[in-house]
């Protein structure tokens, strides 16, 4: 169906947002020690309370901004929402470059969290410009870009002076903003605003087809059906296509639509559980506390080097996950990767508590754990968020789920330090293991396979009612 080149190039440009977000989010990890020391580059050393705020302000910023992301997606569109958020990241680096005051650094970190709705915007944007056959891989690439940004941040932070790191971050973020202007708006967004001709031009651009080709007309008709779903009969996509006339659906408010659409409600609840469970598999803790964890787990190795290798492992796993998303499917990835995450956490927990094996076992599973997590919980929920919702609820449901993600991140980071002091690393990993196994079980029972399906077909999977058991 046309060329995939412009879809891939468009995805690559959108993924510059993820790279820049990975750079700015990882930046605090290797500056905490510097900011606490007497040789700090700031106007004074940070206090313990300020360090706590420094590590968590990004989550607070995300909680503030995410509720507005759905509104901006609908009002500004996917393209200009991307530009708006990317400009916020550039502003972070401008503040850090111009000021050395502790207060301004904390404000910059807060602003980085406010700009983090990039994760929501980019996933939606990518899913709407790519055809079904590559949608999963391209959407998963968004999370790969974040891992690459983390890796880049660790490498630059390890080899560049503090000021030079700030300049590089600024240049990368400004370049990302400029590149986004080259893209065309999502065809689904244009069609939802009644701009059918512009939507056809957008599809023609990304598919490299003539605007009057049959493929484009078919895709526009599919989008129209998605924008005018039959909520009363829960008709299958095949039944919808057999209807001779496609009358415009009654315009419903968001809550009226949710009340009438069983498939939308079920898709939301299932994704909510998967997203929450994914956060509590615990990788965010390992990312933030990488250096002290490596110091305890592998005392003979350099914590900084181990942290860089952690980012390398996650980047590699992200690339593998992106490849497998449209090959193996979303559901198997979530199930088997969660099982692998649980086993890794169980091994790490017993090793850190009982020290039953040599140090290399700890080292191996310290990298297997984030790789398994990235292949499953770190990728699949974001692919599902981008593809399972009808256009009428997509922005708001996606916003709620990403908001929940940040709430869970804040909770786990807030309770982690006292929990660690109370029970130690071993039992903490037991908790992560238990939640990983529960995620695998839940995914096996409730998560449908959405590989290669359009949103109509996906909604049909969620609309299916369980068949009653027949007694013999």
Task: Give the residues covered by each predicted segment.
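AAA+ P-loop ATPase catalytic core
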Residues: 203-206, 223
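Generic detection of long, well-ordered alpha-helical segments
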Residues: 193-196, 213, 217
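Short intracellular "coupling" helices and adjacent cytoplasmic loop segments at the cytosolic face
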Residues: 206-216, 232
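Short, flexible helical or helix-coil boundary motifs
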Residues: 210, 227-230, 465
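TPR/TPR-like alpha-solenoid helical repeat scaffolds
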Residues: 214-229
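Alpha-helical transmembrane bundle of multi-pass membrane proteins
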Residues: 1-204, 232-472
């Amino acid at each position: 169906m046309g060329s995939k080149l412009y879809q891939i190039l468009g995805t690559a440009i959108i993924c510059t947002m993820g790279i820049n977000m990975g750079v700015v989010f990882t930046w605090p990890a290797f500056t905490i020690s510097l900011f606490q020391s007497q040789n700090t580059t700031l106007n004074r050393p940070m206090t313990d309370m300020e360090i706590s705020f420094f590590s968590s302000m990004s989550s607070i910023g995300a909680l503030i901004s995410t509720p507005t992301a759905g509104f901006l997606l609908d009002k500004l569109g996917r393209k200009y929402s991307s530009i708006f958020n990317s400009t916020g990241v550039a502003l972070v680096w401008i503040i850090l470059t111009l000021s050395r005051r502790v207060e301004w650094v904390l404000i910059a970190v807060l602003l980085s969290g406010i700009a983090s709705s990039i994760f929501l915007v980019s996933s939606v944007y990518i899913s709407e410009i790519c055809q079904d056959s590559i949608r999963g891989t391209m959407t998963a690439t968004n999370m790969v870009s974040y891992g690459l940004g983390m890796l880049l941040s660790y490498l630059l932070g390890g080899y560049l002076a503090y000021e030079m790191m700030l300049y590089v971050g600024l240049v990368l973020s400004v370049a990302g903003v400029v590149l986004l202007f080259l893209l065309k708006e999502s065809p689904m967004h244009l069609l939802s605003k009644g701009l059918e001709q512009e939507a056809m031009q957008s599809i023609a651009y990304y598919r490299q087809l003539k605007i009057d080709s049959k493929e484009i007309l078919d895709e526009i008709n599919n989008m129209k059906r998605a924008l005018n779903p039959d909520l009363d009969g829960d008709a299958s996509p095949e039944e919808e296509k057999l209807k001779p006339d496609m009358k415009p659906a009654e315009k419903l408010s968001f809550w009226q639509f949710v009340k009438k659409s069983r498939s939308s409600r079920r898709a939301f609840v299932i994704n909510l559980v998967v997203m929450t469970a994914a956060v509590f598999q615990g990788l965010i803790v390992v990312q933030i506390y990488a250096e002290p964890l490596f110091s305890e787990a592998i005392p003979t190795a350099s914590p900084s080097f181990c942290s860089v290798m952690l980012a390398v492992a996650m980047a590699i796993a992200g690339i593998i996950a992106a490849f497998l998303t449209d090959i193996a499917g979303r559901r198997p990835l979530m199930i088997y990767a969660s099982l692998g995450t649980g086993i890794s956490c169980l091994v790490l927990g017993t090793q850190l508590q009982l020290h039953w094996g040599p140090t290399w076992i700890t080292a191996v599973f310290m990298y297997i754990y984030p790789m398994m997590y990235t292949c499953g919980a770190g990728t699949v929920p974001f692919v599902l968020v981008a593809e399972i919702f009808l256009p009428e609820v997509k922005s708001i449901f996606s916003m709620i789920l990403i908001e929940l993600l940040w709430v869970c991140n804040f909770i786990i980071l807030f309770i982690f330090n006292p929990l660690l002091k109370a029970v130690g690393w071993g039992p903490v990993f037991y908790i992560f293991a238990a939640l990983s196994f529960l995620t695998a079980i839940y995914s096996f029972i409730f998560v449908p396979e959405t590989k290669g399906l359009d949103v109509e077909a996906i909604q049909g999977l969620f609309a299916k009612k369980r068949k009653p058991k027949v007694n013999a």
